[in-house]
């Protein structure tokens, strides 16, 4: 019988990021609002602001590199990560798989906005909390070598749809 794969749950909150490793919660001092308020003075962030934030996020995430087993599976129930998956072109469903490549492509779109392109041209939110969430997710997946994140939860349904 093959050994059970390790499970990692990711929650990017406004003030911190909670990482649950096989039932044990670890907190990172990275949150969407905390990061955006601490490092982004402009909206969208200036390139130098993003570079500084990247270094800080990388350093904080690096604390976990020895705690995560090779082949671990990454999960989340965050609506903000679900929204990133939709922006990356993942079909809305109760379980959505978002690849690290799709996260990178979405971050590349954010980089275009940071360098002057209107957010509306890229179809992404122009808020700094979104930029911070995407940054944290990207660095988490990249530096801890996750190929994908599986987002679980209720499928998004439009409320107050006209009846047929």
Where do the language-model regions lie?
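Short acidic, Gly/Ser-rich segments with clustered Asp/Glu that frequently serve as metal-coordination loops
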Residues: 15-17
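Helical "lid/coupling" subdomains associated with nucleotide-phosphate turnover
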Residues: 1-7, 21-164
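Conserved catalytic-loop position in the HRD/HxD motif
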Residues: 9-13
């Amino acid at each position: 019988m093959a050994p059970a794969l390790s499970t990692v749950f990711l929650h990017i909150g406004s003030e911190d990021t909670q990482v649950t490793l096989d039932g044990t919660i670890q907190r990172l001092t990275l949150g969407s609002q905390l990061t955006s308020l601490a490092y982004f003075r402009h909206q969208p962030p200036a390139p130098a602001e993003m570079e500084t934030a990247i270094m800080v996020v990388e350093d904080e995430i690096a604390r976990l590199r020895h705690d995560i087993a090779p082949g671990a599976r990454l999960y989340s129930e965050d609506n903000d990560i679900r929204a990133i998956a939709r922006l990356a072109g993942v079909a809305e469903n109760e379980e959505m798989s978002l690849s690290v490549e799709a996260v990178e492509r979405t971050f590349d779109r954010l980089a275009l906005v940071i360098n002057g392109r209107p957010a509306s041209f890229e179809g992404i939110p122009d808020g700094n909390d979104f930029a911070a969430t995407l940054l944290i997710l990207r660095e988490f997946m990249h530096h801890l070598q996750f190929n994908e994140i599986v987002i679980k939860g209720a499928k998004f349904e439009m409320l107050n749809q006209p009846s047929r």
